[in-house]
Amino acid sequence: MLFTVSCSKMSSIVDRDDSSIFDGLVEEDDKDKAKRVSRNKSEKKRRDQFNVLIKELGSMLPGNARKMDKSTVLQKSIDFLRKHKEITAQSDASEIRQDWKPTFLSNEEFTQLMLEALDGFFLAIMTDGSIIYVSESVTSLLEHLPSDLVDQSIFNFIPEGEHSEVYKILSTHLLESDSLTPEYLKSKNQLEFCCHMLRGTIDPKEPSTYEYVKFIGNFKSLNSVSSSAHNGFEGTIQRTHRPSYEDRVCFVATVRLATPQFIKEMCTVEEPNEEFASRHSLEWKFLFLDHRAPPIIGYLPFEVLGTSGYDYYHVDDLENLAKCHEHLMQYGKGKSCYYRFLTKGQQWIWLQTHYYITYHQWNSRPEFIVCTHTVVSYAEVRAERRRELSIEESLPEIAADKSQDSGSDNRINTVSLKEALERFDHSPTPSASSRSSRKSSHTAVSDPSSTPTKIPTDTSTPPRQHLPAHEKMVQRRSSFSSQSINSQSVGSSLTQPVMSQATNLPIPQGMSQFQFSAQLGAMQHLKDQLEQRTRMIEANIHRQQEELRKIQEQLQMVHGQGLQMFLQQPNPGLNFGSVQLSSGNSSNIQQLAPINMQGQVVPTNQIQSGMNTGHIGTTQHMIQQQTLQSTSTQSQQNVLSGHSQQTSLPSQTQSTLTAPLYNTMVISQPAAGSMVQIPSSMPQNSTQSAAVTTFTQDRQIRFSQGQQLVTKLVTAPVACGAVMVPSTMLMGQVVTAYPTFATQQQQSQTLSVTQQRQQQSSQEQQLTSVQQPSQAQLTQPPQQFLQTSRLLHGNPSTQLILSAAFPLQQSTFPQSHHQQHQSQQQQQLSRHRTDSLPDPSKVQPQ
């Protein structure tokens, strides 16, 4: 019994120990798990922090367009730090360690502050005047960009009257020492002189203004300058700029303004595209200014609140800004022009503003104007202004000048300073430089060395006036256009001597190499102008020849269509009376034999161009028609006397013309109906000449200022023997085509029997006198306008043809005129029956 109790106690103790051991193990596992979790959390936190730092470091490295791994980021960071350490060591070596320089300022900052305080800028030039370096502070003082001055000659920015003096100063100071030793360069080479320098302008057409400045500096040898401190000079300086014995020597100077400027433009922009915001009332008063404004403009918000924005604008920009604000009030938003804003440091800074009007959300009334101001550089402003003025930027021109000048410098040998000084003694205006820039084309002043202030350009007093390049081109073109050049040989004969002179011209003894190169360039420009003028003259000659050829073709076409007369009539015979070919000169009058036509074609009369004032005058036309009657009675036909028509031909043509111009056309064969209009003049009296038709080379036909009548010639398929007459003579009656000739209609009446007989007898006498071979010169007074009673009689078929041939002309007259014509026609028909009876005294016996 006792043994049993002890065994049970032992078993309970063993169970208790096992449970305690298990519990201890579980507790240890929990502790390890907690430690592991905390360790993992800390490790993850460390990795995340490391990744953030690597990412931030990679964002600061250049060339981070693609994603870089950690090793690349670390490698680039190491390279950057190594280079930065080297640069820092070099800057520490050249750091100014003087008591007068604050230790908290770097060299660049101290230099900029000193230049602003002195109203000056740094300038490094070679001994021949070539500029190799200029500081950025030149923009705020002379309104030049550094790129405008670098690689240019200093003499391009100095008046011509001071060229010789400045050149002597730069050259003679070097010649004081035989050898450029380091001791001389350190001790005795300080140089000071004063002169005028050209101010820059946005618009090159503005008058040039010069600023009186003072140069203070010394000569430096580029050999003693370390390669890291060259600042790119080595690539800028060309070998042709350095004479042999003065190699790698330049004059470094501080250029100061004699008259200080109290308000200057800010020369540089630290960070481009800097901007700040502001709010303005509708009266343009400041209501709000954000935190980005004070570092830019210098004002704190409380200093500008309540003030007008116009208090800070430049006076020259107020007009343009007012227009921009008017546009804003009309459209609600917009962008301003470039304008200057006065900073707290009394400097002008260029800004451009984007603005819009905000409205109240309940009543939609305008509340205020929100503005975003952006800082712009002077280079952007000048480029934009010149684009608005359609002026090319000077940078391409400078590049072109550099390429041209480098070639000219290679061709011209550099002369020594001693020879240059000898030329100074013999020549009043020595050489300046072989370079020529666009700036020098605006400089024109007399000797201004005695004027210590700003001097505007005087364009009237100096003998040598410089003009812009486009004005020179205009003057040269006007001078060339004023000279009359009539052929191609003139232009070619002018260009060839100029070219030979430009290639073979020797250099005069008293002229420098640079002046000769300038003259050579001028002669080359003159040659180009002459060649251009020659091409223009050749084009004009070809155009005139083409016009002359077309005029000749038109004249031949007119004569081929309407001026050849065909007559095919089986029985009747037509005799054309005297045809007179007259001219303005009585010695040139030629007589033509009468033309007898029996159904033949009229031969053409050749008219030579030697008749400069020749006129073709058809003085008389006698048409006699023999009727086929059994009684063999011959009756005379009324005379159709056409008015004189004169045609003036150009004396330059050597072509020939066909038969004389007639107002009537005789058609021999059937043809398609056509209409030809020939203007004819209505003479006022018997002493006036007929209409003059002048054919000129401008393809126009001009007529005299007298009264004109358009005679319509209608050709239609008619039978042989029909005689076509002008439509102004309608069925035997004179018709006035224009109301202005109503006064002459009263004079147009039918001829009586006695007048017809007298006219017939006089015309027969003239006909017989023309046929004599030794007849003297004929003089015929101008004929009056066509006055006749009848054209044809005794032939009803012919009258029907005439009435059918002119239906258009009859329909054009008013009804009242038509009735009047019919009444007059009936009276004349009855009168003609009595007039057509043959005269017994003139009837030939059978």
UniProtKB/Swiss-Prot annotation:
GO terms for biological process: circadian regulation of gene expression; DNA damage response; negative regulation of DNA-templated transcription; negative regulation of nuclear receptor-mediated glucocorticoid signaling pathway; positive regulation of DNA-templated transcription; positive regulation of NF-kappaB transcription factor activity; proteasome-mediated ubiquitin-dependent protein catabolic process; protein acetylation. There is a cross-link at K67, K842 (Glycyl lysine isopeptide (Lys-Gly) (interchain with G-Cter in SUMO1)). It is found in: Cytoplasm; Nucleus; Cytoplasm, Cytosol. Residues 514-564 are annotated as: Implicated in the circadian rhythmicity. There is a cross-link at K67 (Glycyl lysine isopeptide (Lys-Gly) (interchain with G-Cter in SUMO)). The record marks R39, E43, R47 as: Interaction with E-box DNA. GO terms for cellular component: chromatoid body; CLOCK-BMAL transcription complex; cytosol; nucleus; transcription regulator complex. The modification Phosphothreonine is found at T451, T461. Residues 371-845 are annotated as: Interaction with NR3C1. It catalyses: L-lysyl-[protein] + acetyl-CoA = N(6)-acetyl-L-lysyl-[protein] + CoA + H(+). Residues 420-495, 624-654, 764-783, 811-846 are annotated as: Disordered. Residues 107-177, 262-332 form the PAS domain. Residues 336-379 form the PAC domain. Ubiquitinated, leading to its proteasomal degradation. Component of the circadian clock oscillator which includes the CRY proteins, CLOCK or NPAS2, BMAL1 or BMAL2, CSNK1D and/or CSNK1E, TIMELESS and the PER proteins. Forms a heterodimer with BMAL1. The CLOCK-BMAL1 heterodimer is required for E-box-dependent transactivation, for CLOCK nuclear translocation and degradation, and for phosphorylation of both CLOCK and BMAL1. Interacts with NR3C1 in a ligand-dependent fashion. Interacts with ESR1 and estrogen stimulates this interaction. Interacts with the complex p35/CDK5. Interacts with RELA/p65. Interacts with KAT2B, CREBBP and EP300. This is Circadian locomoter output cycles protein kaput. It comes from Pongo abelii (Sumatran orangutan).
